[in-house]
Amino acid sequence: MACGQRGGSWRPSGWFNAGWSTYRSISLFFALVTSVNSIDVFQLVNPAFPGTVICDERGITVEFPSSPGTKKWHASVVDPLGLNVPNCTYILNPEKFTLRVTYENCTRRVHGGYQMTIRVMNDSAALRHGAVMYQFFCPAMQVEETQGLSASTICKKDFMSFSLPRVFSGLADDNKVTKLKMGWSIEVGDGARVKTLTLPEAMKEGFSLLIDNHRMIFHVPFNATGVTHYVQGNSHLYMVSLKLTFISPGQKVIFSSQAICAPDPVNCNATHMTLTIPEFPGKLKSVSFENQNIDVSQLHDNGIDLEATNGTKLHFSKTLLKTKLSEKCLLHQFYLASLRLTFLLQSETVSMVIYPECVCESPVSIVTGELCTQDGFMDFEVYSYQTQPALDLDTLRVGNSSCQPVFKAQSQGLVRFHIPLNGCGTRYKFEDDKVIYENEIHALWTDLPPSKISRDSEFRMTVKCSYSRNDMLLNINVESLTPPVASVKLGPFTLILQSYPDNSYQQPYGENEYPLVRFLRQPIYMEVRVINRDDPNIKLVLDDCWATSTMDPDSFPQWNIVVDGCAYELDNYQTTFHPVGSSVTHPDHYQRFDMKAFAFVSEAHVLSSLVYFHCSALICNRLSPDSPLCSVTCPVSSRHRRATEATEAEKMTVSLPGPILLLSDDSSFRGVGSSDLKASGSSGENSRSETGEEVGSRDVMDTKGHRTAGDVGSKAVAAVAALAGVVATLGFICYLYKKRTVSNH
């Protein structure tokens, strides 16, 4: 038996909008167990609600406990003061012991969700007591309601992700007892294929869960457990059903979601962009882009053609697409900023978001081995009629150079080029057993005036030729050529030595930030690099790096950091070299390493805390190393070290822009700001109290290069500690005196 009850005209502010988003991909329900706040207006008998509250997108269901003694009871929706809520419609089912209400008119909108209060009257003889009021909270069920987050599946290259609203607190609770009762579990798949995993097990399977203040982001890799893969030709679609359960004391949260993703690139021709989706159980409902939501029945009228045989194909007219400049495209690249596809899947609405763009390469590419001549040139011809509209041959340019064609016949619409492989901006690269040379030709269309030269109005043509390794041996006598002198001798090369905050080497310290402050054993990240050169054939090789107590790199004492391109073997904390990745244009132009901050010690005396760093380096020919240091292998033997010694004319020396202030681990400056530390360091005051090798001290080199004992001893430690104690005592006495003086007045 079910009865409906309706009130008068009370309607609180800020109510939930009943028009749920048609692009929902996440369905959630939230079960609160035995932890609902209760307020007994007349008699506080049962402070915790013994039943279950289920929150879903349509409303709230309250399930009361059923027992043989519960025969007569009544429940109603009231406001926080216990008064009946007018205009509230709810369904009370005494047989199933349930109360069902809608969010509209029966709840109060609060931050993050909805609040509802009910009053329960139990008139049974066994459980006779007065009315008890219970207050419930239901979270906002859709991500769109909170912080403007997207509820659709976001397709990436190797995984799909979707956002869930963060509808509870306590994930980071430090209470150990609470943590033992909390935990995640994940159900993957549906039907008989459901697999339940704990969160650590799911992480091992490749899943990941990211949580911030407003949302939870769940990542599902395409090869994870439970992901269904649909394939049709070269098109792929991935689908997964998930149920995430979070259990905490008195509370159970369940998120249910179906996610789909079609990550394949689109195909483009002269007029359309085509998106292909394999056949799967879902049925397309609508397409959304550029703030337009187009129903499937209206696609053709909006420039989109649909093929629904053997999967789904959507043909977008290029008039609907945006354009952007691209290095790989002739003029522009066509794309959509985002495209949302909404499907009806197993009676649920599921959406995915993709970012389609037309893939394009250089439109004209001449690739043939015959273009490369045996004497090291590339020969090719360009005709004006190669394109429509025709090319203006007078505007032809070769790369970024001023090289001109060797022959031009305007009547025939022909120009002929004879380009040296080592000039005119020609580039080369190695692939397997071939060396490939490449250049690019620029030209304007004949219907554009010469003043309109710009990247988006240019025609570009790539010309390539290659030599095989055997061809190089047969046709070119490489051994007879002397190596380029400028690659190892003094020339227009400039080096720079810089320090970085960490091993990401993103942004170096500026000159105005010196002196830098470091504590003992704290790493100092260094980088030596070549500047103002883009020659890919040169390679920077470190010779030596050392530290001094003055800015003069030739001053003594010195301490070695790098010797003959290798870490100093006698160092307690050896230098670590870092590889240079492909994020920079010429990785061979860089050398990166770090060393641990140390105390400067000489003859049992602590030297100045300001330390200056210097490096010497060589520039080598990468293709033909002409110095033993250019191909050094660490560690270096003493015999090889003598053989690899470079002349002073070959080496270049660089220094850091400023010194580094070194402090001991227990220095009283640890809590002081960086600017105060720099001021202290630049004044020459030494605040270290530990200089033994076990805390980061290092021996220095005398003028003959011999090691000097590096133990400061207990006297230096005691002196510094005593001085610090005296200063602290005097400061405390002054403080007491001032305080007493103020109180007397």
Curated annotation (Swiss-Prot):
<feature type="glycosylation site" description="N-linked (GlcNAc...) asparagine">
    <location>
        <position position="105"/>
    </location>
</feature>
<dbReference type="Pfam" id="PF23736">
    <property type="entry name" value="Ig_ZP2"/>
</dbReference>
<feature type="disulfide bond">
    <location>
        <begin position="88"/>
        <end position="106"/>
    </location>
</feature>
<dbReference type="GO" id="GO:0007339">
    <property type="term" value="P:binding of sperm to zona pellucida"/>
</dbReference>
<dbReference type="InterPro" id="IPR017977">
    <property type="entry name" value="ZP_dom_CS"/>
</dbReference>
<dbReference type="GO" id="GO:0035805">
    <property type="term" value="C:egg coat"/>
</dbReference>
<feature type="propeptide" description="Removed in mature form">
    <location>
        <begin position="641"/>
        <end position="745"/>
    </location>
</feature>
<feature type="region of interest" description="Disordered">
    <location>
        <begin position="673"/>
        <end position="709"/>
    </location>
</feature>
<feature type="glycosylation site" description="N-linked (GlcNAc...) asparagine">
    <location>
        <position position="122"/>
    </location>
</feature>
<comment type="similarity">
    <text>Belongs to the ZP domain family. ZPA subfamily.</text>
</comment>
<dbReference type="InterPro" id="IPR051148">
    <property type="entry name" value="Zona_Pellucida_Domain_gp"/>
</dbReference>
<dbReference type="GO" id="GO:0032190">
    <property type="term" value="F:acrosin binding"/>
</dbReference>
<dbReference type="Pfam" id="PF23740">
    <property type="entry name" value="Ig_ZP2_3rd"/>
</dbReference>
<dbReference type="GO" id="GO:0005783">
    <property type="term" value="C:endoplasmic reticulum"/>
</dbReference>
<feature type="disulfide bond">
    <location>
        <begin position="55"/>
        <end position="138"/>
    </location>
</feature>
<feature type="compositionally biased region" description="Basic and acidic residues">
    <location>
        <begin position="687"/>
        <end position="709"/>
    </location>
</feature>
<keyword id="KW-0272">Extracellular matrix</keyword>
<comment type="function">
    <text>Component of the zona pellucida, an extracellular matrix surrounding oocytes which mediates sperm binding, induction of the acrosome reaction and prevents post-fertilization polyspermy. The zona pellucida is composed of 3 to 4 glycoproteins, ZP1, ZP2, ZP3, and ZP4. ZP2 may act as a secondary sperm receptor.</text>
</comment>
<dbReference type="InterPro" id="IPR055356">
    <property type="entry name" value="ZP-N"/>
</dbReference>
<dbReference type="InterPro" id="IPR042235">
    <property type="entry name" value="ZP-C_dom"/>
</dbReference>
<dbReference type="GO" id="GO:0005771">
    <property type="term" value="C:multivesicular body"/>
</dbReference>
<keyword id="KW-1133">Transmembrane helix</keyword>
<feature type="domain" description="ZP">
    <location>
        <begin position="371"/>
        <end position="637"/>
    </location>
</feature>
<feature type="glycosylation site" description="O-linked (GalNAc...) threonine">
    <location>
        <position position="462"/>
    </location>
</feature>
<dbReference type="GO" id="GO:0060468">
    <property type="term" value="P:prevention of polyspermy"/>
</dbReference>
<feature type="transmembrane region" description="Helical">
    <location>
        <begin position="717"/>
        <end position="736"/>
    </location>
</feature>
<feature type="site" description="Cleavage">
    <location>
        <begin position="640"/>
        <end position="641"/>
    </location>
</feature>
<feature type="topological domain" description="Cytoplasmic">
    <location>
        <begin position="737"/>
        <end position="745"/>
    </location>
</feature>
<keyword id="KW-0472">Membrane</keyword>
<dbReference type="InterPro" id="IPR048290">
    <property type="entry name" value="ZP_chr"/>
</dbReference>
<feature type="disulfide bond">
    <location>
        <begin position="372"/>
        <end position="465"/>
    </location>
</feature>
<dbReference type="GO" id="GO:0005576">
    <property type="term" value="C:extracellular region"/>
</dbReference>
<feature type="topological domain" description="Extracellular">
    <location>
        <begin position="39"/>
        <end position="716"/>
    </location>
</feature>
<keyword id="KW-0325">Glycoprotein</keyword>
<feature type="region of interest" description="Disordered">
    <location>
        <begin position="469"/>
        <end position="491"/>
    </location>
</feature>
<dbReference type="InterPro" id="IPR001507">
    <property type="entry name" value="ZP_dom"/>
</dbReference>
<dbReference type="GO" id="GO:0035804">
    <property type="term" value="F:structural constituent of egg coat"/>
</dbReference>
<keyword id="KW-0278">Fertilization</keyword>
<feature type="site" description="Cleavage; by ASTL">
    <location>
        <begin position="172"/>
        <end position="173"/>
    </location>
</feature>
<dbReference type="Pfam" id="PF00100">
    <property type="entry name" value="Zona_pellucida"/>
</dbReference>
<keyword id="KW-1015">Disulfide bond</keyword>
<protein>
    <recommendedName>
        <fullName>Zona pellucida sperm-binding protein 2</fullName>
    </recommendedName>
</protein>
